[in-house]
């Protein structure tokens, strides 16, 4: 399974690690992904998703159904 948020599509970021002597090396900054079982009230069932912690905060604020609808994702297919 790839390291991609199933709701937002967030992926790893290519960055640079800079040492004290300013030597720059490539570094991959991974998304903070969590495997969660979330209750989908409209579908009256649990949905297992791999989401970022940022998406989890938004789900707590808006609700899973409303957030998925705003992103154009059909939870019935998941």
Swiss-Prot record:
Some GO term, biological process aspect, for this entry: which one? translation
> What InterPro entries does UniProt report for this protein, alphabetically?
Ribosomal_bL28, Ribosomal_bL28/bL31-like_sf, Ribosomal_bL28_bact-type, Ribosomal_bL28_sf
> What Pfam family does this protein match (any one)?
Ribosomal_L28
Q: Which UniProt keywords apply?
A: Ribonucleoprotein, Ribosomal protein
Is this entry keyworded Transmembrane helix? Answer: no
Determine if Ribosomal protein is one of this entry's keywords.
Answer: yes
User: Single GO molecular-function term?
Assistant: structural constituent of ribosome
Q: Which PANTHER family match?
A: 39S RIBOSOMAL PROTEIN L28, MITOCHONDRIAL, LARGE RIBOSOMAL SUBUNIT PROTEIN BL28M
> How is this protein named in the record?
Large ribosomal subunit protein bL28
Q: Which domain of life is it from?
A: Bacteria
């Amino acid at each position: 399974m790839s390291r991609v948020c199933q709701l937002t599509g967030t992926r790893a970021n290519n960055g640079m690690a800079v040492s004290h002597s300013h030597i720059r090396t490539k570094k991959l900054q991974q998304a903070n992904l969590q495997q969660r079982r979330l209750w989908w009230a409209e579908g009256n069932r649990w949905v297992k998703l791999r989401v970022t912690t940022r998406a989890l905060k938004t789900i707590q604020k808006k609700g899973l159904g409303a957030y998925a609808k705003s992103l154009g994702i059909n939870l019935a297919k998941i």
